[in-house]
A protein has these predicted regions:
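Short, Lys/Arg-enriched N-terminal segments with co-localized hydrophobic residues
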Residues: 6-17
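N-terminal and secondary-structure boundary signal
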Residues: 17-265
Length: 265
């Protein structure tokens, strides 16, 4: 699936970088990923890269290549996992894997909402039983930032091109139905484009505007990747101008009003 997007932005508008066009291409033809596969090499065989390109990669294929899976037949659920599973109607072994991956459990039912070690908060610790062999579940990479950096470095070594890498995961959203792609790891860019201190169209100083660019790119990548059996686990972006900002995409515990409210439930 190849989509060309045209942005037309007046150059008088705050002097921001003028977008001309962004090309978004699903990287097709990748094999079913197995443990030990050289993912960066497989990607560059299907995709000609240039400096400044961005590649979004589904966390599931990184986990499969690295062997971040669990066999449920080897999992013995404890009392907590069994208790939660009785309420949610899920396999207690699956819930045990969810708890094993979590560093904090925000809610247990009607679904488990957890935080994992990288700071990401999501349903069931991101543990996934889809697109994997029967009896296995896929877990998120423990350090997706490190995974993104390693992929970026290997692609640079193989091609000489300096690209950005975003590791994506499909997540639900508070207050809205449906799932979208979120960035859980990135390299070669900052997560947030910080507009604080800039002026709006009427000259007012912006005080709180911070754009989660990596999530916006991940969300579009997820549209191209699709779900179910679409089979496009990586997406290539060309033409996105560089931006400046910071990486503090996750609220600190004291800042997160939703976490505070959930802890009171």
């Amino acid at each position: 699936m190849n989509t060309r997007i045209f942005f037309h932005i007046s150059p008088e508008r705050r002097g921001i970088i003028l977008y001309t066009s962004v090309t978004v291409t699903g990287i097709r033809g990748l094999p079913l990923i197995q443990k030990g596969d050289d993912l960066p090499r497989l990607i560059i065989e299907k995709c000609a890269l240039e400096d400044g390109d961005i590649i979004c990669i589904a966390s599931t294929i990184i986990s499969k290549a690295k062997g971040y899976t669990r066999n449920l037949n080897d999992v013995i659920p404890d009392d907590r996992a069994t208790r939660i599973a009785e309420k949610t109607g899920e396999d207690p072994r699956f819930i045990q894997v969810v708890l094993d991956q979590a560093c904090d459990v925000l809610i247990e039912t009607p679904f488990t909402l957890t935080e994992v070690s990288c700071g990401h908060v999501g349903v069931r610790s991101g543990v996934d039983a889809s697109n994997v062999e029967d009896g296995l579940v896929i877990t998120l990479p423990a350090d997706p930032m490190k995974e993104a950096e390693e992929i970026r470095t290997e692609i640079k070594d193989l091609t000489g091109k300096t690209c950005g890498i975003i590791v994506t995961d499909t997540c639900g959203r508070s207050f809205r139905r449906g799932q979208t792609g979120h960035a859980i790891g990135w390299s070669g860019m900052s997560a947030i484009r910080d507009f604080r201190g800039d002026s709006d169209l009427f000259g007012h100083t912006l005080e709180i505007t911070e754009e989660a660019v990596v999530d916006e790119i991940a969300g579009f990548a997820n549209l191209i990747m699709g779900e179910s059996n679409n089979g496009v686990p990586a997406v290539h972006f060309r033409g996105i101008p560089a931006w400046t900002g910071h990486n503090d995409i996750y609220f600190k515990e004291g800042e997160d009003v939703i976490r505070k409210a959930l802890k009171k439930v």
